[in-house]
């Protein structure tokens, strides 16, 4: 009985440590995104493929009531969960400026020229129609707006399909080579603003800018 209880306590402790480490990493990423993207009060920011929305909610705290944040999600269950989370935070007066948008395979479903900044965190390597999506991302940004793409090099042996089903064959595994990411987005009309190769969890971040017409 004591042994079982001891094991249970140990497992709970390990789970707590893992959770806190993951939370600290996300907080670090949010702080770095704020810096490299230049978030300011009153701006409009979108988190495309937002998942649980941590990065979009992080942006919402910075842009404030005079700004706006879009959280887009393709998966219907995740989108509904985001909507529920927004309502929960609104009820506690934690957010007043966040809108959830149903994403699409080939476009952001965001208004044209609406965003000062767009985040794609570990999303780009899932995109099955990069030419169309890249064009949509460009349209969604204001002139001078920034696009921050966080990705990781191709990896073998992940639990998901390897590479992701339906993506271009040049990915080389689950993930995307930085060189290919940059080539595709510059071809779409973006300009590289900066490249950060020491992003947490063996990832990289490339910040692009939509040049003024």
What are these regions (language model features)?
Residues 173-188, 192-195:
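Short alpha-helix
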Residues 192-213:
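Core SAM-dependent methyltransferase catalytic element
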Residues 60, 131-146:
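A short glycine-rich, Lys/Arg-flanked "PGG" loop and its adjoining helix->strand segment in the class I
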Residues 114-131:
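A short SAM/SAH-binding and catalytic strip from SAM-dependent methyltransferases
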Residues 25-43:
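Conserved alpha-helix/loop element of class I SAM-dependent methyltransferases that forms part
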């Amino acid at each position: 009985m004591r042994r079982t209880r001891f094991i249970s306590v140990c497992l709970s402790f390990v789970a707590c440590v893992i959770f806190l480490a993951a939370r600290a990493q996300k907080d670090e990423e949010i702080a770095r995104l704020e810096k490299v993207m230049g978030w300011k009060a009153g701006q409009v920011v979108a988190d495309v493929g937002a998942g649980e929305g941590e990065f979009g909610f992080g942006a919402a705290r910075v842009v404030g009531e005079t700004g706006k944040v879009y959280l887009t999600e393709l998966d219907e269950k995740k989108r509904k969960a985001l909507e529920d989370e927004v309502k929960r935070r609104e009820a506690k007066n934690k957010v007043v400026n966040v809108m959830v948008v149903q994403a699409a395979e080939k476009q952001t479903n965001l208004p044209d020229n609406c965003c000062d900044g767009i985040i794609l965190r570990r999303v780009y390597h899932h995109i099955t129609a990069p030419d169309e999506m890249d064009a949509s991302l460009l349209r969604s940004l204001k002139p001078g707006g920034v696009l921050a793409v966080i990705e990781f090099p191709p990896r073998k042996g992940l639990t998901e399909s390897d590479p992701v089903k339906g993506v271009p064959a040049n990915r080389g595994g689950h993930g995307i080579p930085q060189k290919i990411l940059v080539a595709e987005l510059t071809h779409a009309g973006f300009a590289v603003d900066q490249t950060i190769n020491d992003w947490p969890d063996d990832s990289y971040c490339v910040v692009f800018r939509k040049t003024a017409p």
